[in-house]
């Protein structure tokens, strides 16, 4: 009887240790490249932040803000992560004689992420995701009557214990016949609880010039389940947003 009791205790302790040993939190923000890794099964995560951008074209200036943006994530299966989110959007448009400001609720999106392959040698870790903006969601200028679908193939090669190269490629479609491409390349490093990245990305416009940008940022893991981040980006040509700032948090529950 005592032996059975000890065996049960050991099994319970092993299960508890395994359930808790999931490493430190990682997020899909603030970079343009989503994390290739998925949340462990039965783990819930909240990611939220502030995004500001400014762009000036031919004397017309547009300032946009997410106040805030929000993504909810859940590890449903070892190979499937469920995600959904939205944002409160502010926009200020200004030219020589007219100033307009609007605050609206952005469209609601769902974005499952699928694990495809674990890294082995030169073979990268691979996953895929698709952001589906639900038709008719959002208000005012942010309302999307047709919906949209943004697809991403996500890849990552570990270069060392604290350095990795991630890259993504995909398409952006608004369901009205317009489809553009996207790609990004990101180098990231970790130094204990501090992480940093730099990233090159481009929107490949169908029938038009590409928008090219560069950004970089840092993140700090305050605890294994809570992190903060800050990033800044610049447009490298006139077709990209001039400058943007991104800051936020991630909180994990398990």
Regions from the PLM with identified roles:
Residues 4-13:
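Sec-dependent N-terminal signal peptides
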Residues 13-14, 29:
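Generic secondary-structure transition motif, activating predominantly at the C-termini of alpha-helices
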Residues 15-19:
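Sec/Tat signal peptide C-region and signal peptidase I cleavage site
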Residues 20-254:
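Transmembrane beta-barrel domains of Gram-negative outer membranes and organellar outer membranes
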